[in-house]
């Protein structure tokens, strides 16, 4: 009887604590939302979802595009400006419908921000788990705070981007693969196809790895999830796939977002295109050899290669938003964790310096509007750092001292 009462009190205490923390988090975010007008990416999801519920307007309709443009610019977008055309699969809107029911944009955005903050913390936890490190609570807190407040993460939360959800799904799929939950991994990868320009290469890599190990249940989960989502989408909007295809084409013709090609053309007007092609060729060659090397290997090697792929994605020359670099958070934490695990006090010092350098450097670049840092310098720096720790990631610990290091 006494044990039952103690358990009941503990459960009640935990519930009160969760409700209190959740309420405080919601209230703090709501105050921030009312003071700082932003959330353009979320508005581009919320408004089509609301119009679908209230008026039956499909997400790809120009009515939605014009409403988002007027909210952003106060008018229709000019030819050189971002159009904010909805360019994701239809089922994304179905997943956003719960917040689409909320008529108050501030309340809806607040709930979305709280969800993104929790996703960011979860992503940091998944990254540390994949790195094989069991750090102290201080390190866990530091990693979570870094994920929340470094420039790409903070901006993705501020604007309401889906990229953090995408990162959690893709790297969560690798975690599921490590635990042999293959069908779940396939479902995660199917849901990770929302931002194809961000996640496409990483998902392709994981698909090649899965085929090399003949883990067909992953493909079964992937295809089953896509089939269910696609079927529901066709029931609601029979023409959604063609609308989605043409919206992608319209978006790719835009020139509002920067790319490595536009940066190099600005620096070297006569050689920019050739230099951009050379950078892309080097990225393709490097990833070709790494993708070949990871076939048949374990999930730690796959994690490292996926991090490298995410970091090098901007070098392929596609239009790329700096916010999307939040997808590379696990790569940063992988470098941080290897330094902390393998090199003792010196490693901890270098890990903190690296983390601080990335944090400060990207915020300086954001405040100074230095797009080249996000799309060129940061990927180069992270590529160097990933190769610096490659040997320790791809080779399992062989000595008892290495095993002890992973526990600390």
Residue map of PLM features:
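Membrane-embedded alpha-helical segments of transport systems
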Residues: 194-198, 228-232, 350
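Primarily membrane-embedded glycan-assembly and transfer machineries that use lipid-linked glycans
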Residues: 1-184, 209-329, 333-340, 369-371, ...
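Transmembrane helices and adjacent periplasmic/lumenal helix-loop junctions
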Residues: 189-208, 316-324
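Aromatic-enriched
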Residues: 335-408
């Amino acid at each position: 009887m006494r044990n039952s009462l103690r358990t009941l009190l503990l459960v009640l205490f935990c519930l009160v604590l969760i409700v209190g923390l959740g309420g405080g988090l919601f209230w703090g975010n709501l105050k921030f939302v009312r003071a700082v007008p932003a959330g353009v990416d979320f508005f581009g999801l919320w408004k089509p979802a609301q119009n679908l519920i209230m008026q039956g307007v499909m997400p790809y309709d120009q009515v939605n595009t014009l409403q988002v443009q007027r909210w952003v610019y106060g008018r229709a977008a000019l030819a050189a400006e971002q159009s904010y055309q909805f360019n994701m699969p239809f089922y994304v809107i179905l997943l956003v419908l719960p917040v689409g029911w909320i008529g108050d944009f501030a309340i809806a955005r607040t709930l979305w921000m709280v969800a993104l903050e929790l996703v960011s913390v979860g992503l940091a936890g998944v990254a540390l788990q994949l790195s094989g490190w069991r750090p102290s609570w201080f390190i866990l807190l530091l990693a979570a705070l870094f994920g929340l407040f470094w420039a790409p993460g903070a901006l993705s939360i501020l604007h309401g981007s889906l990229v953090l959800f995408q990162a959690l799904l893709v790297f969560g799929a690798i975690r599921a693969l490590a635990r042999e939950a293959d069908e779940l991994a396939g479902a995660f990868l199917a849901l990770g196809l929302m931002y194809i320009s961000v996640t496409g290469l990483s998902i392709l890599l994981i698909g090649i790895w899965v085929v090399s190990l003949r883990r067909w249940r992953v493909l079964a989960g992937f295809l089953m999830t896509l089939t269910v989502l696609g079927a529901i989408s066709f029931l609601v909007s029979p023409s959604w796939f063609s609308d989605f295809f043409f919206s992608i084409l319209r978006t790719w013709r835009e020139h509002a977002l920067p790319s490595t090609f536009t940066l190099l053309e600005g620096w070297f007007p006569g050689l920019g295109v050739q230099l951009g092609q050379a950078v892309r060729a080097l990225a393709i060659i490097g990833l070709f050899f790494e993708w070949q090397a990871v076939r048949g290997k374990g999930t730690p090697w796959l994690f490292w290669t996926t991090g490298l792929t995410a970091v090098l994605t901007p070098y392929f020359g596609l239009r790329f938003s700096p916010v999307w670099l939040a997808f590379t958070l696990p790569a940063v934490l992988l470098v941080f964790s290897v330094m902390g695990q393998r090199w003792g006090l010196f490693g901890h010092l270098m890990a903190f310096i690296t983390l601080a350098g990335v944090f400060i450097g990207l915020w300086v670049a954001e405040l100074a509007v230095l797009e080249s840092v996000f799309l060129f310098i940061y990927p180069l720096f992270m590529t160097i750092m990933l190769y610096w720790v490659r040997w320790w990631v791809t080779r399992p610990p062989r000595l008892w001292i290495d095993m002890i290091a992973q526990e600390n």
